[in-house]
């Protein structure tokens, strides 16, 4: 609860600045890259979120990280501020909130699409088009692969789930046969 409200405050402040400067999309992308980089490196995550390391040590790492990702000054300043306040552990929630605000601002929604095998470009585009019709918004797909689905696709947009997986169809058939 507290983490969410703190993350929301930071995200809203940065988002307001991004809107003012017309940099919503680039900052959203660079923040997502930053989040993925931090989450993809357990050692980096440990150093950034562990107060055992001095502020100077964390600041030096944050400076290198910002330079490596070529972050613009404002997103980089967010990193420095989080480091100075021992709140780098909030980064993931801040980025997620920023991206949600950016998507809303730009009139788009994100859909998590899970398939049994990787989707090719045309299949992914067809799914995005169908979901766009259903939601009346531009849909961005976050794709995942789960072989346990056996076949088909499960798409989640917000709280709505469209389940066209073979696994679910087989489970439904099994339930009907038991009756």
Swiss-Prot record:
Q: Name the job this protein performs.
A: F(1)F(0) ATP synthase produces ATP from ADP in the presence of a proton or sodium gradient. F-type ATPases consist of two structural domains, F(1) containing the extramembraneous catalytic core and F(0) containing the membrane proton channel, linked together by a central stalk and a peripheral stalk. During catalysis, ATP synthesis in the catalytic domain of F(1) is coupled via a rotary mechanism of the central stalk subunits to proton translocation.
Whom does it interact with, and what assembly results?
Answer: F-type ATPases have 2 components, F(1) - the catalytic core - and F(0) - the membrane proton channel. F(1) has five subunits: alpha(3), beta(3), gamma(1), delta(1), epsilon(1). F(0) has three main subunits: a(1), b(2) and c(10-14). The alpha and beta chains form an alternating ring which encloses part of the gamma chain. F(1) is attached to F(0) by a central stalk formed by the gamma and epsilon chains, while a peripheral stalk is formed by the delta and b chains.
Localization, per the record, is: Cell inner membrane
Q: Would the keyword Cell membrane turn up in this protein's UniProt record?
A: yes
Q: Name the gene.
A: atpH
- Please give an example of a GO cellular component term from this record: proton-transporting ATP synthase complex
The family classification in the record reads: Belongs to the ATPase delta chain family.
Membrane topology per the record?
Answer: Peripheral membrane protein
Whether Ribonucleoprotein counts among this entry's keywords is no
The molecule here is called ATP synthase subunit delta
Question: Which region is the signal sequence?
Answer: none
Q: What GO MF annotations does this protein's record show?
A: proton-transporting ATP synthase activity, rotational mechanism
Q: Which NCBIfam families match?
A: ATP_synt_delta, PRK05758.2-2
Main localization is membrane
Q: Which InterPro entries match?
A: ATP_synth_OSCP/delta_N_sf (IPR026015), ATPase_OSCP/dsu (IPR000711)
